[in-house]
Amino acid sequence: TTLMSRFTNAYGEALVTDHPLLTRLAATADRVASATISSIAAIGIPKARAATIHTLATLVASGEVRIEPAVDVRVLTRQLLEVPGIGPWTAEYIVMRAVHWPDAFPASDLVLRRNAGNLTPSELVRAAEKWRPWRAYAAMHLWRR
């Protein structure tokens, strides 16, 4: 996305390759933690969201929070939910994408709910029980419908 491009340009490390579109690495937690909330907001991120990003980057950079495949997802989810500005959808999305947890399922997602038959989040959670422990794959399928 455009916003992700601006974020990567601002905080990602420069990369020299033969490919003209590969010019930066993803931003590291250390680099984002060393930025100010105002500078993060200046690239077009709402200030409250910039504060959330900064707080999470600081926790990851310090080692207090580990976002990696070997973590206990229950512990990580609890830690994520303690960060102001991170709710259940974001926590589930992080464990799905960054930790590769196959049972993550952001049941409050509007597209998932619509594509599953306009279910409420609690109805979708109940319906998704039969997809355990592979609910993230079901989410990917529903997002593509």
PLM-predicted stretches and their roles:
Residues 1-145:
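HhH-family (HhH-GPD) DNA N-glycosylase catalytic core used in base-excision repair
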